[in-house]
Structure formats: C-alpha cells, structure tokens
C-alpha cells in the first residue's frame, strides 16, 4: 500500500479528528480565497468599469476627475476635440433634481446633462455614458432617460411624462418645474446602490434649470484614436489648467489612496488565516502521531523505512488540506458574494463596482498557499517520526 492509501486509512480510523481538520481548513481556505479576491478586486472592477464605456481619458479640474468643476467646459471640450489624436469629447454636467410622484414625496435624483464635441462629422452623434435597457436614448431638450429604480418607484415607462425640478447652482435655490418626456430606461454604470439618476442632453439640463446652467461641467470624457497616453499629454499641453488622466492612471491613483486600505486589510488577514491553518493542522497531526507512536515503531520494526513513515505523515497533511481546500472554493465564492452585496451598500459606491473579483492568478496563489500550509504544518510531526527510537518506544508500549 502506498503512502497516500495508508494515510487515508489512518484518517478514516479517526473520523472526528479528520473532520475537524477538513472543516477548519475549509473555513480558513474560504476566508483566504476571499482575501485574495479582495486584494485586487476593486482595481480590476474599476478598470473594467472605466473601460466599458469606450472613453479612455478623463479630464477634470481637480486631482481626480470629477472632484472640481471645469470652468468654460464647452470651450475646453471643443479645443480638446480638435486635437488630431482625439476622436470625440463628451461633456458631463450633474445637477440635483426632484421628480414629482402622484403619491408620496418627490424622488431626489441626480440629473446628468451631456453633449458631444468633435472635429469629425462622423463622430458627432451623442455617445452617452449610460446604457439603454428599454426604449431609446434622449435626443431632444424635452427628453430624458431614467434608471430602473426611478421607473419602478414613480411608475414610469418610455412615453411617460414627468415633472422635474432641477437645481444647477445651489441646493437652496427655488426649483423650477419642467415637464419632460421619459423616452428610455437606462443603466448608469457609476450610480450608487442607494441613488437615483436621470440623464439627457446638455440642452435638456439647461431647460430643466431654467437656463441657469452656465459653462461649467463636472467632467470631460475623451476617446482617443488609440494612443491614450500620448493624447493625455497633448490635452495637458493645450489645456494646462486641466488635469487629463488615462483610465489606468485614474485606477493607479485610486489604488494608492482609496483602495490601499482594502489591500492592507487583505494582506493582514491572509497572513493570519494561513498562520491559523498551519497551527491547526500541525496540532492535529502532532496529536495523531503521538497517539500512534507504538504503531509507527512497530511498522518500522517490520521493515518500513524512515522515509516511508515520514511520507505517511506528509500524506495525511496533504489529504486534510487538499480536501478542505476543495471545499473552501464554493464556500469562499458564496461568502464573497454575500460580503460584496454588504460592502456595495456603503454610500457612494457604484452598483456596478465589485469588491471581490475572481482572477485565475488568485486561484493559483490560493493553491500555492495551501500546498505550503500542508508542508509546513507537517514538519514537526515528520521530525517526531523520523527520530523515533524504535526499541525504546516498543519497550515503553509493552511496559505501559
């Protein structure tokens, strides 16, 4: 019988201890997998979210795009759009708004007004930063699209009319009432879980604000001809008062600031979980070996080599960790899904952003750490059996 088969029989003879080890590794392995998914989850998810719309450069007035409003944004967007390496530029201006309902208080929403600037007539069509789910996109000053939450709570559908009161200057100003037609239900990628968003053209926003919208904007999205880094440098040259950043640069800045906390938490908890797994398996194997010292000495006397009994102990560790590791995969993915829903409920977190993102490299690191755990946890028990004095142990067994 080979070492693995012999180790399996040893574990079957002690089902309670084996089950404790397997369940412990499964729990630790699930948490370990989640920490590995969390370590790069936000970075991968944010990169995908930024790239999804096709805009590879973001232009703003602050350190991070969208934090400070851009003065003379329409003029700046036109200047940017005339660069040879720019395909199109999209100006986004947000305003606080309320949508009246037939029953209940008004819905507080964020209204995004957008307009396209381009030097090419072929690229002049509006490319909104949202995805139409039902109906069509808003094209006229009296048309808007709303998210599914607004449609559900206000009982709206494509073709419905709403009374919207927008505030483009300050939240304390009197909100004028404007009748607009809902032409589509849209998905807004950066909308938070507990927020509502509506969208339309820049002219629709100006109409909703009674013309009091000004020339400021929150963000300018730019699509390059292919060279995002070179285009960002060209934008910084023609608009020195603005900050242009590629999607990768935006993610890099977030990784150094907002996302660094989760990476640190992931590293600490990964170290703790691996250490706990090593201690758990080492204790279980040591107790098992100490209870079977007489049996192991007898096997050595019958001809089992030192290498063979060491392999038996290592095989026991591998079976416990391997079985627990396999169980930890579905358990870890289920736990990650639940934790992701909880964390996405925090204020200001886009609903499309995920904290836990599966990557093949995370699975490879997970497997490597479990293999290392099985080996390290078995070192002390293997040392015990390798140095076991056969004659003295058998004599103690007979006397005892």
Language model regions located:
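Basic-flanked hydrophobic alpha-helices used for secretion and membrane insertion
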Residues: 131, 136, 149-245
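Short helix-to-coil transition segments within interhelical loops
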Residues: 11, 300-308, 388, 397
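Short helix-loop junctions at transmembrane helix boundaries
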Residues: 326-368, 379-388, 392
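Peri-transmembrane interface segments
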Residues: 42, 230-279, 288-290, 299, ...
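Short beta-strand boundary microenvironments
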Residues: 110-154
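Hydrophobic, regular-secondary-structure patches
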Residues: 29-110, 128, 134-137, 233-238, ...
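Transmembrane alpha-helical interface segments in multi-pass membrane proteins
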Residues: 273, 286-288, 294-340, 365, ...
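N-terminal Sec/SRP start-transfer signal
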Residues: 1-31, 43, 256, 311, ...
